[in-house]
Amino acid sequence: MSDDVALPLQFTEAAAKKVKVLIADENNPELKLRVYITGGGCSGFQYGFTFDDQINDGDMTIEKQGVALVVDPMSLQYLVGGAVDYTEGLEGSRFVVTNPNAKSTCGCGSSFSI
């Protein structure tokens, strides 16, 4: 997808840069970062990240800096208007989701409720 098109989910430059480094480390240019939502965590839903070399029917793909973020349709409905970012700080480094649909989140930020 083009950067000029309004996307339902943003893939930040910092996240794309880190994905690019991690894919290079794996020596598999077919890998994409997949973000998904599952039931669980202390707030009802939790975010998950994995590297995947497949794009399934219905998946949305966002490309930036030559790498791709992939989201399945079920997860996307909970992520519309959000952003996938990468942060480094005192708590360590990690991919994070900023989600305007979340009514509450847990302290670690990986679990939320709607």
From Swiss-Prot:
Any GO CC annotation of this UniProt entry: cytosol
Cofactor list: iron-sulfur cluster
Keywords linked to the UniProt accession: Iron, Iron-sulfur, Metal-binding
Disulfide bonds: none
UniProt cofactor note: Binds 1 iron-sulfur cluster per subunit.
A molecular function GO annotation: 2 iron, 2 sulfur cluster binding
PROSITE patterns according to UniProt: HESB
Function statement: Required for insertion of 4Fe-4S clusters for at least IspG.
Subunit structure: Homodimer.
Protein name per Swiss-Prot or TrEMBL: Iron-sulfur cluster insertion protein ErpA
The organism of origin for this protein: Enterobacter sp. (strain 638)
